[in-house]
Curated annotation (Swiss-Prot):
The keyword Iron does not apply. NCBIfam families: PRK13667.1. This is DNA-directed RNA polymerase subunit epsilon. RNAP is composed of a core of 2 alpha, a beta and a beta' subunit. The core is associated with a delta subunit, and at least one of epsilon or omega. When a sigma factor is associated with the core the holoenzyme is formed, which can initiate transcription. Keywords: DNA-directed RNA polymerase, Nucleotidyltransferase, Transcription, Transferase. One of its GO terms (cellular component) is DNA-directed RNA polymerase complex.
Length: 77
């Protein structure tokens, strides 16, 4: 499954909507998605959303859609 993860770059600064960033990733479930992000980044996770059907198609066509793979070279910085 593909997940959209909304996050802040670190856990120290108070979250602000204007600084929220997005990454897309594959995982078996939402728990695994959260664990992968927490283990591999210092990010403050705001929301993890499963993308399916029309919402996945929309993101692929209208956003800077690039899957992040942890354990390899990350596609997001």
């Amino acid at each position: 499954m593909i997940y959209k993860v909304l996050y802040q770059k670190d856990k120290i600064v108070n979250p602000r909507r204007e600084t929220t960033q997005t990454l897309y990733m594959e995982a078996d479930n939402i728990v695994q998605a959260r664990a992968l992000v927490e283990q591999n980044t210092p990010y403050n996770i705001e929301l993890i959303q499963e993308l399916t059907g029309n919402s996945l198609k929309y993101e692929q066509e209208h956003a800077d859609f690039k899957l992040t793979a942890f354990g390899q070279t990350n596609s997001e910085d």
